[in-house]
């Protein structure tokens, strides 16, 4: 029986496949090969060079002072490059390859893998997880990356596999060559196509979810990551926030780090955001919702304060006169007197 080799491009995807294989959710002779590096970020000009990739990560991490602890380090990256190439070289002509992708990171990883395999005569299938919608009762779920798939649903996505023919293979390799020639540090999927874009591509999204009053940095990061159709690393968004602070579009308060740091949009940031009318509309809608939420919170807060004052006044009613009670509780004399009518005191 032919062996099926699933090639994926994120740690979360690898975890799902390993679990599915070890628990026999995936039947038959199946394996998983995993590539770690996120080739959608950083320079790939003139090809993938591990030392250049490491240099870029070192620079990126050094500049990104308030980046959280990452899931892997440089040693992990080096080891995975070696492991990945070693496992790819062992692929046999009788093996069937499933290349899984959905996000720009996975798309770039897939192109890199296809470039490595281009001189081999292999049976290759592509699986774009965005092509499958999982329905359960009245809920529909569409994964944006392979890492979002639960092990139990892998077979459903695999059913949408399509065989890679020679013409498409050539087109994908040509696309990879064009991307490598671009002097860009960011690649995203736009209208289903992988493209090089400017490094400030996500700046509008960041500003769109940054309020005019100071708010925890994590809230903005979460909104950008959660509401964007394009999957991007939190490290990259952190770095862009730093750049927006440098250019005066965002102001920060507190120590320059993730935990505890607060940010708000500046007038310069609003001018920049206004260049995108749809983004500005979303920012204004969010601001209105925030004001309404704050109004509700203030209402309940005032109700709580009033209850505390009334409770105190009740306790003092038998020992102090109305004027003194009013002074001590902050209630008016009329409110103190009305306690007798409302509460029978």
Regions found by a protein language model. Name each.
Residues 64-111:
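Long, hydrophobic/aromatic-enriched structural stretches that serve as scaffold segments
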Residues 231-246:
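Short amphipathic alpha-helical interaction segments
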Residues 1-71:
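A structured, charge-rich N-terminal accessory region that forms the first stable segment of a protein
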Residues 287, 291-345:
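Elongated, amphipathic alpha-helical interaction scaffolds
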Residues 141-215, 219:
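A conserved mid-domain beta-alpha-beta active-site/ligand-binding segment of alpha/beta enzyme cores
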Residues 267-292:
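Short, amphipathic alpha-helical interaction segments positioned at domain boundaries
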Residues 245-256:
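A short, conserved structural fragment
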Residues 222-234:
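Short helix-coil junctions and helix-kink-helix linkers
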């Amino acid at each position: 029986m032919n062996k099926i080799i699933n090639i994926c491009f994120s740690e979360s995807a690898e975890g799902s496949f390993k679990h599915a294989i070890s628990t026999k959710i995936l039947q038959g002779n199946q394996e998983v090969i995993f590539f770690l590096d996120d080739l959608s970020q950083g320079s790939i000009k003139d090809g993938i060079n591990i030392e250049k990739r490491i240099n870029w990560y070192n620079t990126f991490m050094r500049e990104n002072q308030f980046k959280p602890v990452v899931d892997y380090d440089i040693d992990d990256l080096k080891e995975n490059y070696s492991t990945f190439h070693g496992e790819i070289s062992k692929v046999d002509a009788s093996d069937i390859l499933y290349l899984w992708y959905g996000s720009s990171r996975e798309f770039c990883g897939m192109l890199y893998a296809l470039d490595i395999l281009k001189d081999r005569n292999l049976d290759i299938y592509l699986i774009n997880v965005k092509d499958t919608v999982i329905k359960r009762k009245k809920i529909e779920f569409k994964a944006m990356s392979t890492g979002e798939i639960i092990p139990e649903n892998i077979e459903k996505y695999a059913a949408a596999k399509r065989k890679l023919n020679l013409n498409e293979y050539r087109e994908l390799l040509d696309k990879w060559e064009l991307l490598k020639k671009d002097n860009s540090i960011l690649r995203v999927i736009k209208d289903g196509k992988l493209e090089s874009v400017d490094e400030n591509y996500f700046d509008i999204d960041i500003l769109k979810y940054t309020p005019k009053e100071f708010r925890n940095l994590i809230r903005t990061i979460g909104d950008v990551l959660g509401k964007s159709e394009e999957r991007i690393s939190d490290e990259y968004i952190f770095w862009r926030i730093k750049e927006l602070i440098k250019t005066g579009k965002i102001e920060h308060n507190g120590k320059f780090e993730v935990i505890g740091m607060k940010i708000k949009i500046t007038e310069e940031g609003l001018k920049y955001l206004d260049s995108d009318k749809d983004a500005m509309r979303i920012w204004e809608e969010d601001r209105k919702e925030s004001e309404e939420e704050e109004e509700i919170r203030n209402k309940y807060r005032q109700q709580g304060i009033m209850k505390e004052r009334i409770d105190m006044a009740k306790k003092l009613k038998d020992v102090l006169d109305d004027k003194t009670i009013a002074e001590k509780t902050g209630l008016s004399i009329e409110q103190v007197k009305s306690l007798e009518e409302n509460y029978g005191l």
